[in-house]
């Protein structure tokens, strides 16, 4: 496995930020680079990529744009910044891919690493592609482990990605052969407020009844009397959780509550539901997020025999400073638990883990 080098910097002028990163990267062999830029620099992404390739000599690059980017112990949110990492992988151990915008593209995209079957992949996705969830699931079926990690571009400008060039519109990233060893974990940051319920009547994303009772009545019982008295207070605190069938870790997909109809006692969530589906309600707050982050980091640490060589971290834009605090607290937790090692990533508009899209999660992947 290669060793990794990394750099990160903020500057209004993209060249200043890029040069600061390149200086930190230093000299040494590298075959693959990871490049994340904040959306304030999105309009210059092509120039930034060309500059990194020219100045470092690294031939292959992957990455994307985020409202925020991150590096070891550091978060850059709402400022012009770049985070980059480089590793010297064997030539036949990885393959950069792009142009996956439809089901047919998933079937046809070249993922083999030399002659080796791809084992897993790091993926960046365009949130404006309405098939993105299905594309992620299908692409996971093309890699041997069935495991993808990554995130959806988050940008107030262009939703651009890097895959040996600047691309957009679908999925891109890099696949790896099984001689590239990784460890990965996910942290949810929410805690259930009540038991699982069965959807007994629904229409598209509107829940009519749960367990044979009016959906809003069940919801109010679960969230408790204090919140139920003033439903205007639940925004950003209470979410719908959709348990993942067959998960041995109790994982669930977190979806926003998008509407409440008190007169008809209905609830609308950010997901289409069929009768028979399971749903629960959960709460997101700083205490819960810290506890689950600590659990995740302890879990991944216990499975390691040495310090990570490098890593990537993909966290929801709804986490970071708004959930953990303003002084890069989320990234500092990783450093404190696992030590100082090269790490880069970005704050996503949806996170990819295994074969699914998540929300309000953090996905940590370590090269070991």
What residues fall within each predicted segment?
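Small-residue-enriched flexible segments
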Residues: 1-53, 59-60, 64-324, 328-341, ...
């Amino acid at each position: 496995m290669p060793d990794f080098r990394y750099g990160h910097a903020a500057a209004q002028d993209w060249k200043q930020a890029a040069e600061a990163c390149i200086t930190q990267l230093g000299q040494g062999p590298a075959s693959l680079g990871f490049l994340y830029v904040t959306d304030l620099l999105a309009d210059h992404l092509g120039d930034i990529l060309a500059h990194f390739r020219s100045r470092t000599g690294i031939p292959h690059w992957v990455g994307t744009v985020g409202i925020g980017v991150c590096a070891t112990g550091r978060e850059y949110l709402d400022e012009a910044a770049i985070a980059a990492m480089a590793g010297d992988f064997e030539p036949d151990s990885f393959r950069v891919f792009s142009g996956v915008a439809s089901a047919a593209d998933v079937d046809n995209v070249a993922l083999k690493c030399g002659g080796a079957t791809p084992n897993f992949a790091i993926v960046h996705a365009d949130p404006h592609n309405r098939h993105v969830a299905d594309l992620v699931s299908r692409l996971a079926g093309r890699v041997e482990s069935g495991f993808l990690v990554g995130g959806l571009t988050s940008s107030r400008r262009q939703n651009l990605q890097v895959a040996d060039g600047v691309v957009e519109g679908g999925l891109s990233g890099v696949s790896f052969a099984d001689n590239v060893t990784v460890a990965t974990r996910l942290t949810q940051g929410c805690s259930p407020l009540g038991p699982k319920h069965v959807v007994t009547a629904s229409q598209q994303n509107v829940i009519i009844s749960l367990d044979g009772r009016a959906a809003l009545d069940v919801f109010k019982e679960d969230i408790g009397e204090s919140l139920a008295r003033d439903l205007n207070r639940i925004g950003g605190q209470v979410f719908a959780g959709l348990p993942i069938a067959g998960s041995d870790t109790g994982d669930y997909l977190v979806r926003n509550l998008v509407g409440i109809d008190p007169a008809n006692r209905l609830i609308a969530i950010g997901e289409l539901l069929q009768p028979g589906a399971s749903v629960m309600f959960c709460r997101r707050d700083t205490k819960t997020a810290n506890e689950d982050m600590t659990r995740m980091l302890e879990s991944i640490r216990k499975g390691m025999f040495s310090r990570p060589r490098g890593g990537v971290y993909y966290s929801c834009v709804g986490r970071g400073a708004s959930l953990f605090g303003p002084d890069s607290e989320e990234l500092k937790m990783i450093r404190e638990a696992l030590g100082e090692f090269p790490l880069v990533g970005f704050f996503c508009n949806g996170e990819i883990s295994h074969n699914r899209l998540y929300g309000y999660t953090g996905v940590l992947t370590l090269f070991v």
